Amino acid sequence: MRATKAIIHLDNLQYNIKEIKKRLNKNVKICLPVKADAYGHGAVRVAVAAIRAGVSYLAVASIQEAVELREAGIVAPIISLSLPVLEEIPELLKYDIEPLVIDEEFINDLNRFAKKLNKKAWVHLKIDTGMRRIGCSPMEAVKLAVQIDRAENLELKGVCTHFAVSDSTDEKNIKFTKKQISVFKDSIKEIKKAGINPGLIHAANSGSVLQYPEAQFDMVRPGILVYGYAPSPSLNSLIDLKPVMELVTQVVLIKKIEKDTSVSYDRCWTAEKETFVATLPIGYADGLMRSLSGLKVRIGKDFFPIIGRICMDQCMIDIGASPWVQRWDEVCIFGPVSKEHPKNNTAQDLAKIAGTIPYELTCDINKRVPRIFIDETIQ
């Protein structure tokens, strides 16, 4: 097995689900997004652990992601959060995947395919309340709900929306989110007035789970919270979470270099004095962004900086003039904070350095990095 690996702490995942449940009203379900291979954590194993911890629904971004789960034996309901193309509809129906619907044309196409294949399609009507990505306008919601209700081979399983800035503490953004919630509630009222059961009503993402209890409705869709991070550092204090992914590698070579010796591409780092350099078999092709040069990584209880350019497959660290570090020592790039390692880097720390978000950090960990799953313990 490669020296570089992602350790997936499924016990932490289940801990996070328990913490989220504490914030939910009675009988509110959880739909866990496992798109992008569960944000890089491994969709199948994450889905199984999450279902054992009480997650009711799964969400994906593509039909292929849903098929992977079905073929692994997962029978829980799965929502596809992205719009499928016509060629994907037969597979969607075959594997009982619940798509979002947003317009008359797709509703008609889906009903036609379902009738031809003698299948029933369960759908979720997506209303655009402010994200401006996908969804029908609130003014069209009732008309489309009626169309679904009248379609012989369709059933309205739910109505949903998505919040654009629910993780923000800025007053303007709070006002915007509250407006989204209000528009969504009004749309649901109108659908009910038309005599149609909206099914599962769901809207809350991670930010709104923490800040807007009025947006819980029947089901919530927390993504990054389950994987151990608040969607914004400003919300860290609102919930106790444990990062699920730990990225580690090993020292594969140690060499002594003299003062004024340059390291790596472009010669952008030069030794100010005699020192030892350790090579690590991890680079930007594994998901360690080039912008993370300078990051201090942990060996034992000490931290050492990445020096020079991060290469495609390797990087180098300065371990000092009198190193105790040895070849094959384990190196932690990021992982959970613990009593043993209270100063561990987290994906949120790396995201701050790289000018991005933890989602991108974990999603970018390449498939060639093996995932090692620490079996969950349900308490």
Swiss-Prot record:
Q: In which pathway does it act?
A: Amino-acid biosynthesis; D-alanine biosynthesis; D-alanine from L-alanine: step 1/1
Task: State the top-level EC class.
Answer: isomerase
Task: List required co-factors.
Answer: pyridoxal 5'-phosphate
- Can the keyword Isomerase be found in this entry's annotation? yes
Looking at the UniProt record for this protein, which Gene Ontology cellular component terms does it annotate, in alphabetical order? cytosol
Enzyme Commission number, as recorded: 5.1.1.1
Under Gene3D superfamilies, the record lists: Alanine racemase (3.20.20.10), Lyase, Ornithine Decarboxylase, Chain A, domain 1 (2.40.37.10)
CDD domains per UniProt: PLPDE_III_AR
Task: Show the GO MF annotations.
Answer: alanine racemase activity; pyridoxal phosphate binding
Q: Which residues bind substrate?
A: 133, 312
Pfam families to which the protein is assigned, alphabetical: Ala_racemase_C (PF00842), Ala_racemase_N (PF01168)
Q: Which domain of life is it from?
A: Bacteria
Isomerase as a keyword? yes
PTM sites of type N6-(pyridoxal phosphate)lysine: 35
Alphabetized InterPro entries for the sequence: Ala_racemase, Ala_racemase/Decarboxylase_C, Ala_racemase_C, Ala_racemase_N, Ala_racemase_pyridoxalP-BS, PLP-binding_barrel
Q: Which SMART domains did the record assign?
A: Ala_racemase_C
**Family according to the record:** Belongs to the alanine racemase family.
NCBIfam families according to UniProt: alr (TIGR00492)
**What this chain does, per the record?**
Catalyzes the interconversion of L-alanine and D-alanine. May also act on other amino acids.
Give the protein's recorded name. Answer: Alanine racemase
Give the originating organism: Treponema denticola (strain ATCC 35405 / DSM 14222 / CIP 103919 / JCM 8153 / KCTC 15104)
